[in-house]
Amino acid sequence: MAKKSMIQRELKREKLVAKYAQKRAELKAIILDINSTEEQIWEAQIKLQKLPVNSSASRVQRRCKVTGRPHAVYRKFGLCRNKLREYAMAGDVPGLKKASW
């Protein structure tokens, strides 16, 4: 199981991403807009750089909902491979069955 502090850190990052998502999208739109002047683009880039680093969506890492494990997490289930196998063998994951051919 992951340390509780690491799980809380990821939750804090998710909150920051949600808080700054709209502002970040607006600044990126200005930067990518063809009709923007160089000064507008320059100002938008500076404002974007001044936003918190953890407000970027790429900083958030998927974690297992049960254990908090950061690696080998299946997006569809939100579980790491170990817990997914454990739950699948117990029949707790609807629609999932062991492959046999």
UniProtKB/Swiss-Prot annotation:
Question: What is the role of the protein in this entry?
Answer: Binds 16S rRNA, required for the assembly of 30S particles and may also be responsible for determining the conformation of the 16S rRNA at the A site.
- Subunit details: Part of the 30S ribosomal subunit. Contacts proteins S3 and S10.
**Would you kindly state one Gene Ontology biological process term found in this protein's UniProt entry?**
translation
Q: Which UniProt keywords apply?
A: Ribonucleoprotein, Ribosomal protein, RNA-binding, rRNA-binding
Q: Which domain of life is it from?
A: Bacteria
Name used for this protein in its record: Small ribosomal subunit protein uS14
Family under the similarity heading? Belongs to the universal ribosomal protein uS14 family.
One Gene Ontology cellular component: small ribosomal subunit
Entry's Pfam families? Answer: Ribosomal_S14 (PF00253)
Q: One GO MF term, please?
A: rRNA binding
